[in-house]
């Protein structure tokens, strides 16, 4: 399915495959602009990925089907339950690849990440592979017009985050916020400026660009 969508229905251009680790475990952190983002990422990484997928909203049948095909761990976007964290950590302990959308919702431009996903990134002590996907916005209109849209998937250099939380609660909250924003800046560096959203003008983005 990933191959059919990414190489037949759309023209997918992938940059940065040299940065993909040879083996897991690691976390793939992706912007979320469209429901087909997981398919494009799975095609680009070319390895099995378990995605954290929203379970707290009504979704279309084809999204449910896609989730079953990709492999997904259901999660509540407003509260990352202990059972979800446990399943995600178990997957990483097995050496699997975990796909996360830090914003936990789709939109036109980048938004602030949810703390639960940031917490998981720290708790797992795994490297994070940032990925930016762009070009799916008008996919339905293009298909109806008989146009095969061009989609860009950019893969950045993997990076690490601190592995321990400070005992002080205020410092812990600040750490979650800072690391979450840092993850988003790595993703923003792979996207055009018009999509930087809440991170527009952030100086870290230029530092993280190739």
Task: Give the positions of each predicted feature.
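N-terminal membrane-anchoring alpha-helices
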Residues: 1-13, 204-207
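Short, highly charged C-terminal tails/helix-capping segments
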Residues: 195-210
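Residue-level preference for the first positions of well-ordered beta-strands
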Residues: 25-27, 95-101, 129
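Catalytic core of membrane glycerolipid acyltransferases/transacylases, capturing the structured
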Residues: 7-8, 15, 20-79, 87, ...
């Amino acid at each position: 399915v990933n191959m059919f969508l990414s190489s037949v229905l759309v023209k997918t251009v992938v940059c940065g495959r040299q940065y993909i680790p040879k083996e897991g475990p690691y976390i793939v952190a992706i912007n979320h602009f469209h429901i087909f983002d997981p398919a494009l990422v799975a095609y680009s990484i070319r390895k099995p990925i378990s995605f954290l997928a929203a379970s707290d909203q009504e979704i279309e049948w084809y999204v449910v089907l896609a989730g079953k095909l990709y492999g997904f761990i259901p999660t509540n976007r407003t509260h990352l339950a202990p059972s979800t964290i446990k399943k995600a950590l178990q997957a990483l302990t097995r050496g699997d690849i975990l796909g996360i959308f830090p914003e936990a919702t789709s939109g036109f431009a980048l938004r602030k990440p949810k703390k639960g996903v940031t917490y998981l990134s720290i708790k797992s002590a795994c490297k994070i592979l940032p990925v930016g996907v762009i070009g799916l916005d008008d996919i339905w209109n293009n298909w109806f017009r008989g146009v095969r849209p061009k989609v860009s998937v950019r893969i950045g250099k993997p990076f690490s985050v601190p592995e321990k939380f400070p005992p002080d609660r205020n410092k812990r909250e600040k750490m979650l916020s800072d690391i979450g924003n840092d993850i988003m800046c790595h993703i923003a560096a792979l996207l055009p400026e018009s999509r930087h959203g809440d991170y527009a003008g952030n100086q870290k983005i230029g530092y993280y660009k190739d």
